[in-house]
Curated annotation (Swiss-Prot):
It comes from Legionella pneumophila (strain Corby). S-adenosyl-L-methionine binds at G32, G33, H34, D52, F78, D100, Q107. Its EC number is 2.1.1.199. InterPro entries: RsmH, SAM-dep_MeTrfase_MraW_recog, SAM-dependent_MTases_sf. This is Ribosomal RNA small subunit methyltransferase H.
Length: 308
């Protein structure tokens, strides 16, 4: 089992520009790599609130961070960040929010969670085990057109239709219940394998995103972040594939541009009302980090700041 390593750790902490007495949110606690580093930069007056969908992560936080009075964990999605900030009484006063998107190494490496096409396990893929719909429900019950749409939209899978049909044909014989069963069906249906990429990679990503509503949650969270942050509060987001990064990039660009009037209205750029700016360029891992942790290779960090 791979040791969990926080990706772009130092770069994201630097991007948050942490104030010793500040208030921070780690929207994706995982195994606390980023949270631990944030706490290392805080004084006794500082506060850190963390969120995670995964009850294993929440329990880990309570076991290893529970005695730290500066720290509090919430069970749920980062799409509930405004609700949690309200409960904590810190809306409009938060100095920084960190989001480290996607599946964590402990989830990926545990066969019982069903995220990996390399490990035999139940076809589950739920980040939050308290939710009712899992990957097996979707794979065995969705219509062929819905399967194809999800594979295309969330996996950018070229052969979405062919793979969807193969799944429907296979489940007529018996339900698809394990990860390796599904991976084999996809492998057989995929006529052109990408170099250095397992043929089931895109389909598994698509199902995981769909089951966990990852992109919907991300969009909802980003919209709430500006309400949660205080003036000069920072937002740091680490994404791992183009679909996530596109949403983050577009959000930050739109917020920086502000409320643009119609093109025919004569108004100077500096007169546009905006309360957000992007900070620096997108940051990618250095070759040394990729060598040490191959899962970091596709990571992109984007940072923004609320102005007022």
């Amino acid at each position: 089992m791979a040791k969990h390593q926080s990706v772009l750790l130092h770069e994201s902490i630097k991007g948050l520009a942490i104030k010793a007495d500040g208030i921070y949110f780690d929207g994706t606690f995982g195994r606390g790599g980023h949270s631990r580093e944030i706490l290392n930069h805080l004084s006794d007056k500082g506060r850190l609130f963390a969120i995670d969908k995964d009850l294993d992560a929440v329990q880990y936080a309570k076991d290893y961070f529970g005695l730290d009075k500066r720290f509090q964990i919430f069970h749920g999605s980062f799409a509930q960040i405004k609700e949690f900030a309200s409960q904590a009484g810190v809306i409009g006063a938060v100095d920084g929010i960190l989001l480290d998107l996607g599946v964590s190494s402990p989830q990926l490496d545990n066969p019982e969670r069903g995220f990996s096409f390399m490990l035999q396990g139940p076809l589950d893929m739920r980040m939050d085990l308290t939710q009712s719909i899992n990957a097996a429900n979707f794979v065995n019950e969705a219509e062929v057109n819905e399967l194809a749409h999800v594979f295309r939209a969330y996996g950018e899978e070229r052969f979405a239709g062919r793979i969807a049909k193969a799944i429907v044909d296979a489940r007529k014989l018996k339900p698809i219940t394990t990860t390796l069963e599904l991976a084999e069906i996809v492998k057989e249906a995929n006529p052109k394998w990408e170099k250095h990429k397992h043929p089931a990679t895109r389909v598994f990503q698509a199902i995981r995103i769909h089951v966990n509503q990852e992109l919907t949650d991300l969009s909802n969270c980003l919209e709430q972040c500006l309400d949660v942050l205080g003036p000069r509060g920072r937002l740091a987001v680490i994404s791992f594939h183009s679909l996530e990064d596109r949403i983050v990039k577009q959000f930050m660009r739109d917020k920086e541009q502000g409320n643009r009037p119609p093109v025919e209205v004569p108004i100077k750029y500096e007169e546009l009302k905006t309360n957000f700016k992007r900070v620096g360029k997108a940051v990618k891992p250095q070759s040394s980090e990729i060598k040490e942790n191959v899962r970091s290779r596709s990571a992109v960090l984007r940072i923004g700041e609320k102005l007022a």
